[in-house]
A protein has these predicted regions:
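Beta->alpha turn/N-cap motifs
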Residues: 61-65, 75, 79-89, 106, ...
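Short helix-initiation/N-cap motifs at beta->coil->alpha
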Residues: 59-70, 157-185
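Ligand-binding "clamshell"
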Residues: 90-102, 115-117, 189, 194, ...
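Periplasmic-binding protein-like
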Residues: 137-146, 245-266
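A bilobed periplasmic-binding-protein/Venus flytrap-type ligand-binding module shared by bacterial periplasmic
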Residues: 109-120, 222-237
């Protein structure tokens, strides 16, 4: 298995120099799958299983949540796997990408974590709360704060909630917006942090299951998707790889190891 990891400066230089080709894939060309660290380990298991079945797959790991869609739209990768539909729709609206969900992956729990406090009642007035800074996942963080009873939001705003939609904030909490993949680092400094168990497990700094509150697995809009350009929907390599990801016992074991009980298979209903 071959895994390529791009840092932002390297990606920018490569794109500027035109080092990525946009040629159509050949039948025997490897399927290029873009992802981020949170989802890489189970995908690596799928890549290994695909190899056993004669399918060449190359995993391309990105360090941010912007480059995977840029690279997919440019044709540098064939599919990406890191985002749910609300995030995708926001990216399409912002950048004009012609990208579509192809198949569901997993849905992860997201929680509120605190190093200092054991309950929301213990949070002091003016407590600092770190949530994601992208438009969609910040809305998910605000929904969590509302579920915890720390704020109330305007009716019906859902995942599109912004700080302007906060109606009441009785503890006068101070909201800090941080890049989602960096939220785990805010655990030591903020009083309360929106946390993604997959990144917490990777960081190995605290227990991913120790959240004061999880958002539950009932919001299907947050299922992570395999995303493609529409023209690739009949690519047999893609169809086979997704089938392996969804049904291989080896991949399921890797998912269980990576996410514990804090995920659900989105293709299972």
């Amino acid at each position: 298995m071959k895994t390529i990891r791009f840092t932002q400066p390297v990606k920018a230089l490569a794109l500027a120099l035109g080092l990525f080709s946009a040629v159509a894939h050949a039948a025997d060309a490897p399927l290029k799958v873009g992802t981020t660290a949170a989802f890489a380990i189970p995908l690596e298991a799928a890549v290994e299983e695909a190899g056993k079945q004669g399918l060449k797959v190359e995993l391309v790991e990105f360090t941010d949540w912007i480059a995977p869609n840029v690279s997919l739209a440019a044709g540098d990768i064939d599919v990406n796997y890191f985002q749910h539909i609300p995030f995708l729709e926001n990216a399409k609206a912002a950048s004009g990408f012609d990208l579509v969900p192809f198949a569901p992956g997993i849905i992860n729990n997201v929680g509120l974590y605190s190093k200092r406090y054991k309950s929301f009642a213990e949070l002091p007035e003016g407590a600092t709360v770190a949530i994601a800074n992208d438009p969609i996942n910040s809305g998910r963080g605000l929904q969590l704060l509302a579920k915890a009873g720390l704020i109330t939001l305007k009716p019906g705003v859902g995942y599109k909630a912004t700080e302007d939609d906060i109606v009441t904030n009785p503890k006068k909490i101070k909201i800090l917006q941080v890049e989602a993949v960096q939220l785990v680092r805010a655990y030591d400094d903020a009083d309360l942090v929106q946390g993604y168990p997959a990144y917490i497990r990777l960081a190995k700094t605290f227990d991913a299951g120790s959240a004061l509150l999880f958002d539950g697995l009932d919001h299907k809009e947050y299922v992570i998707q395999f995303v493609i350009q529409p023209k690739e929907k009949n690519d047999p390599r893609l169809i086979k790889f997704v089938d392996i990801y969804q049904h291989s016992p080896a991949v399921r074991a890797a998912l269980d190891k990576a996410h514990g009980k804090l995920y659900q298979a989105g293709w299972e209903g």
